[in-house]
Design a protein with these regions (language model features):
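Conserved small helical "lid"/interfacial subdomain of P-loop NTPases
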Residues: 225-252, 258-259, 270
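Winged-helix-like regulatory helical subdomains adjacent to P-loop NTPase cores
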Residues: 262-346
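Short amphipathic alpha-helical interaction segments
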Residues: 341-360
Length: 396
């Protein structure tokens, strides 16, 4: 009986299954080592949804903490909208990750009596200073971090702070202006500042930061994550199935690789669905095709807005969407799609475009020109392509 899946959809990949990204890891470590020389380093890790940003950050944190003796912490900022909450979560994460270390007593005074145990049996902790003290931390953030680096000198080489899921509060100018002021203060007042910040966000978040504070982007070393190549995808699937003593037929492996399209989000969703569908120790193409349909349904339910999900799956427009979904493409020209439609589908195509626009699934692509549309969320064409691919294979 199967006890666990080696695949982790929606979560960072386990370190033992991490593949590819060698050049990016080398680049990140180069900046990390520069921070140990007393220089503030700022990296913006950019990539589309499901491309593996958090996995790469988690790998970096593990090696810098365990192998390079950094004080490292990974701060998840979903739902954060204020600078007070941002700074509170940073210090709370430092406390949670390191309060059981011997050296932590050197900085424990900074947390005072503002740490509370919560939950059953006090298994979780929160850092909750009064709002006025949080405001002071926001205003004196560089000094607070510098004091920590001074206290742990000799025990830790530098601070490594990952700010993950920054999409929410970057829509306002507050963060961009505050972070620019933070970096400027360090440049002028701190000769030594061994701190390495990694911000993680979508490409459009970089654009938003630039609009709010045009000079901010020159501060960051931008690292962009691209899709994995086929060899890396194959390596990942082999590692994952080997870990649970399962084999995979060559044609099944080829199909999984093709439909994963180099995207970790698809690799994990397809892999997990295939794993649970298989009843024998060898994965066949039959398992894979069943897994693709399951994975498409999972992605639709997990990542798409319910109204969008229902609209995309409606029989009225499904045939059109399947023709759009013959390839993963973020944009399309309406005449290219019209040429693929039969007479009945062509009659409703205008209504289709109007309805998809009303739901916020597509918008007119002004930059491309007249007749061009693009998907608002890059997961939409992924889902449509995957569902379309599964439908075709089911018909065979």
């Amino acid at each position: 009986m199967k006890e666990y899946s080696p695949f982790t959809p929606g979560n960072p990949v386990p370190l033992e299954f991490f593949v590819g990204r060698e050049k990016l890891v080398t680049e990140i470590f180069r900046y990390a080592h520069q921070s140990t020389r007393g220089r503030l380093e700022n990296v913006f890790l950019s990539g589309d949804r499901g491309i593996g940003k958090s996995s790469l950050a988690s790998l970096s944190r593990f090696f810098l903490q365990e192998k390079e003796n950094f004080l490292a912490t990974h701060v998840f900022l979903g739902g954060t909208e204020t600078l007070n909450e941002l700074v509170r979560r940073i210090f709370e994460a430092i406390y949670k990750d390191h309060n059981n270390k011997n050296w932590f007593k050197k900085i424990s005074d900074y947390f005072g009596n503002h740490v509370n145990k919560v939950g059953f049996f006090g298994i979780d902790v929160t850092f909750n200073p009064p709002e006025e003290k949080l405001a002071q931390l926001v205003n004196h953030f560089p000094q607070a971090l510098y004091n920590i680096t001074e206290k742990i000198k000799g025990d830790k080489k530098a601070l490594f702070i990952i700010l993950d899921d920054i999409n929410g509060f970057c829509k306002k100018p507050d963060f961009a202006n505050w972070y620019k002021s933070f970096v400027d203060y360090v440049a002028v007042h701190q000769l030594e500042f061994p701190v390495f910040f990694m911000l993680i966000g979508l490409p459009e978040i970089r654009d938003a930061l630039s609009e709010h504070q045009p000079s901010l982007l020159r501060i960051f070393r931008v690292i962009e994550i691209e899709k994995l190549n086929n060899d890396e995808v194959i390596q990942f699937f082999n590692k994952a199935f080997d870990s649970v003593q399962m084999k995979i037929d060559s044609d099944a492996l080829q199909t999984m690789t093709e439909y994963s399209n180099g995207l970790p989000i698809l690799m994990h969703e397809i892999g997990d669905a295939v794993f649970w569908d298989a009843t024998a120790n060898t994965i066949t193409n039959k398992n894979v095709l069943a897994g693709i349909l399951q994975a498409a349904d999972r992605i639709g339910k997990k990542y798409l807005d319910p109204k969008v999900y229902r609209a995309i799956r409606s029989e009225r427009y499904r045939a059109i969407l399947r023709k759009i979904g013959e390839a993963i493409q973020p944009e399309f020209h309406k005449h290219d799609i019209l040429d693929k439609l039969n007479e009945t589908e062509q009659k409703v195509f205008g209504n289709f475009l109007k309805r998809m626009t009303e739901l916020g699934i597509i918008i007119k692509d002004i930059e491309k020109g007249r007749g061009y549309y693009k998907f608002v969320n890059k997961l939409y064409p992924i889902y449509i392509w995957l569902e379309s691919a599964g439908f075709k294979d089911k018909k065979k």
